[in-house]
Structures are given as C-alpha cells and as structure tokens.
C-alpha cells in the first residue's frame, strides 16, 4: 500500500429510500456526486437493488479534510432539500482497507 492510499479515507453509505422518495433522491445524487472530484473524492462503487429503494455507495477522499470540505460545500448543501424531501435514511460508516 502506498502512502497516498494509506491516508485516504473511505466510507460506505447505506441508503434506504421510500418508493415515493426515489425521484428526489436520484435528483440529489445527480447534483452532488459530480462534485466529488473537486474535493479529491471518488465514487468507488454504487449499487442499487431492483426496485430502487436501497443503495450502497463506497466513496473515498484523499483526506478527512477533503471529506469535510465536500460535506460543507455550498454547492452540495444547496441541494439538501431534495435529500430531505426524499425521506431517505442514510447510514455512513467509516471503513478501513484491510487488503
């Protein structure tokens, strides 16, 4: 593992979306996921179940500071109303690479 890999921070995001909120949740994701590279972030993997009510994302950032900057970015927070309106339940888990 290189030094740059060891300093990266990785998260798993598990999302539970009510059927009525799927459209708003996807609109939110369409707005905020493209911002990741601006903050040295990367969407490693995005999975969705067949009916669209569950998603799992694996995301990484070059540093915790980059992650915090992404979370606080006005371009991202401007779309928070879509996430709220979707009524999605999110679980964000910090992870460590063990391989």
What residue ranges belong to the model's regions?
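Short S/T/G/P-rich N-terminal loop/turn motif that feeds into the first structured element of a domain
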Residues: 1-72, 93-99
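C-terminal structural segments of small proteins and small subunits
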Residues: 67-68, 74-86
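Short, mixed-charge low-complexity intrinsically disordered segments
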Residues: 88-90
């Amino acid at each position: 593992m290189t030094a740059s890999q060891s300093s990266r921070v990785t998260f798993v995001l598990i999302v539970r979306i009510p059927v009525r909120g799927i459209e708003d949740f996807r609109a939110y994701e369409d707005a905020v996921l493209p911002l990741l590279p601006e903050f040295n972030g990367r969407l490693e993997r995005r999975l969705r179940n067949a009916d669209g009510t569950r998603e799992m994302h694996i995301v990484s950032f070059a540093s915790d500071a980059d992650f915090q900057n992404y979370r606080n970015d006005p371009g991202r927070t401007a779309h928070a109303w879509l996430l709220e309106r979707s009524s999605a339940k999110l679980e964000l888990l910090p992870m460590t690479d063990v391989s």
